[in-house]
Design a protein with these regions (language model features):
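Carbohydrate-binding surface patches
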Residues: 379-445, 484-491
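Substrate-binding cleft and catalytic face of glycoside hydrolase catalytic domains
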Residues: 43-252, 288
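Mature N-terminal, pre-catalytic/accessory segment of carbohydrate-active enzymes
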Residues: 1-44, 484
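Aromatic/acidic polysaccharide-binding cleft in carbohydrate-active enzymes
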Residues: 280-409
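C-terminal beta-strand-rich structural cap/linker in extracellular carbohydrate-active enzymes
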Residues: 450-493
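Substrate-binding surface in catalytic domains of secreted glycosidases
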Residues: 237-271, 291-305, 311-314, 348
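A structural motif corresponding to the C-terminal end of an alpha-helix
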Residues: 76-86, 141-151, 190-202, 226, ...
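Short, acidic/polar
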Residues: 26-40, 137, 141, 214-223, ...
Length: 493
């Protein structure tokens, strides 16, 4: 029995429907627009993180002076803002024109290059004044172009400077933390100066940490010592990685994810920054969104109901922890790598634009309210996140899963009972499980045939998030059939 109370015990900001759209330079492409359009239409995402892609903007003119071409950048941001998205912008990467260092270019992708044959430049600028000027010119341009709405966005300096893939690849990211951090602090200081010359109010932050906790501590202490402005702290958190999954050292686990979250929080508190909001501008049940089943067979969970159950359990744990979290952004970094439909990349849609269960979980999460109500739950393995609107409506998310999301779990029927009288109100029940809103499982049951023609239509239809049932309540309870890794949403209106 699950009993849903009527009293709001805490308020939770609507921060869960956010993503990193990757690669940023797919925003101007038809396939990228198709995904973005659908996210906006379904209300699955309201805030998007993109790279500024300063390497597409800054160049040298014939006299060797810095010059700027904002047209491609404008195309991207115009499109995103036209659909009403709020933006988080990472000022990255380093334009080739301000660093003379040879090497230091990486793909951070399955392929030898990034999207459209590009490479990531992780070398520091030769002259930080030029980096500052580029940050100033970019901020000035978008502040003038988009006006007051920019003040609701967030800007941060670079991406994952603590690891070799993104910054100063010649330095060991575990043994040479201090040297790497000192260089990044220079980058951050001039980023803040450049932004503030153009805009006095937009929120600025860093470091968009990947995983090196010592780097985070070094950075925060450096910010304090240098007296630098910082309005929020950006960190990335992944529950595990493919290498640990392959070795059996770790399994999928929200507890492991929350341990990594709290490791970051403890450093933030230790360094005296507990007053600042936290922006988790990348998350995933596993890192390496550009890896798939070729590198790690367990990554096939990304195609299944497991990923949606993980998401619901994770946001419940974050809600319970009452952290100063302002953004939670799933990173969709496998989108451009696909050559088949179901291979385990970290994205919302397959190659043929078939919705995955994780996408549908985001659609359901968008229906949650800001008021979290009391709840009694004595069902083993069941996570319940009950919310209430200021108009008295309810939206209750549930996930039934073991800690490691194993399929070996008893199938049960449980009753969700509301303490408030809901008779005559409209009840709608949505479900994601092995048989509902799950194209991959349907394809498996069909014998994994070649995906083409009519089958694409069938799988797209299966991927649509439709109510399992909708009815006028005649009692204050709803019965649910719980199967392994099932997700439910119950709304009362």
């Amino acid at each position: 029995m699950i009993k849903i109370g009527s009293s709001v015990v805490k308020e939770q900001k609507k921060i869960f429907n956010q993503c990193v759209f990757h690669p940023t330079d797919a925003v101007e492409d038809a396939w990228g627009k198709r995904i973005i359009d659908k996210m906006a239409e379904d209300g699955a995402i309201d805030t998007v993180r993109v790279y500024a892609m300063l390497e597409d903007i800054a160049y040298r003119d014939e006299d060797g002076n810095l010059a700027y071409d904002f047209r491609t950048s404008d195309t991207r941001l115009d499109y995103l803002t036209s659909l009403g998205f709020n933006l988080v912008i990472a000022y990255a990467g380093i334009p080739d024109c301000i660093t003379s260092k040879v090497g230091g270019r990486t793909s951070v992708a399955k392929n030898k290059t990034r999207y459209k044959g590009k490479m990531w430049n992780g070398n520091p600028p030769d002259d930080y004044a030029e980096w500052e000027e580029i940050c100033y010119q970019y901020t000035k341009h978008i502040s003038e172009r988009y006006g007051e709405r920019v003040n609701g966005w967030k800007f941060h300096c670079f991406n994952e400077p603590d690891v070799v893939n993104f910054f100063m690849g010649e330095l060991d990211d575990r043994k040479e933390v201090a040297k790497r951090c000192a260089e990044y602090l220079n980058l951050y200081e001039h980023f803040v100066r450049g932004v503030r010359r153009a805009n006095k109010t937009v929120m600025v932050g860093g470091p968009a940490l990947a995983c090196v906790i010592d780097f985070l501590e070094c950075f925060l202490n450096g910010v304090k010592e240098r007296g630098l402005e910082m309005n929020y702290i950006a960190v990335h958190t992944y529950g595990t990685d493919p290498e640990l999954l392959n070795s059996g050292e770790e399994t999928l686990s929200v507890k492991a994810m929350m341990k990594r979250v709290m490791d970051r929080v403890r450093v933030i508190e230790k360094c005296g920054f507990s007053h600042l909001p936290i922006v988790m501008d990348e998350w995933g049940a596993s890192s390496h969104g550009f890896f798939n089943s070729e590198e790690c067979k367990i990554l096939m969970f990304r195609e299944t109901e497991i990923n949606s159950a993980y998401f619901i359990r994770f946001i419940k744990e974050l809600t319970d922890a009452s952290l100063p979290l302002e953004n939670l952004m799933i990173c969709l970094s496998g989108q451009h790598e696909m050559v088949e439909d179901f291979t385990g990349f970290r994205n919302f849609f397959t190659l043929n634009f078939i919705k995955k269960p994780i996408y549908n979980a985001y659609v359901l999460a968008s229906k949650l309210h800001t008021g979290v109500v009391e709840c009694e739950n004595n069902v083993e393995y069941l996570t319940v996140l009950p919310t209430k609107s200021d108009k008295g409506g309810y939206a209750v998310a549930l996930a039934y899963a073991k800690e490691d999301f194993s399929p070996e779990i008893a199938e049960i029927t449980e009753t969700v009972e509301f303490s408030e009288n809901i008779v005559d109100k409209k009840i709608t029940v949505w479900c994601i499980d092995g048989e509902c809103a799950n194209p991959y499982r349907l394809w498996q049951r069909m014998g994994e045939p070649r995906i083409e023609g009519e089958l694409i239509k069938v799988l797209r239809e299966e991927g649509k998030m439709k109510p399992k049932c909708s009815f006028c309540a005649t009692e204050n309870a709803v019965d649910l059939k719980l199967t392994a890794n099932a997700v439910y949403l119950i709304t009362v209106e």
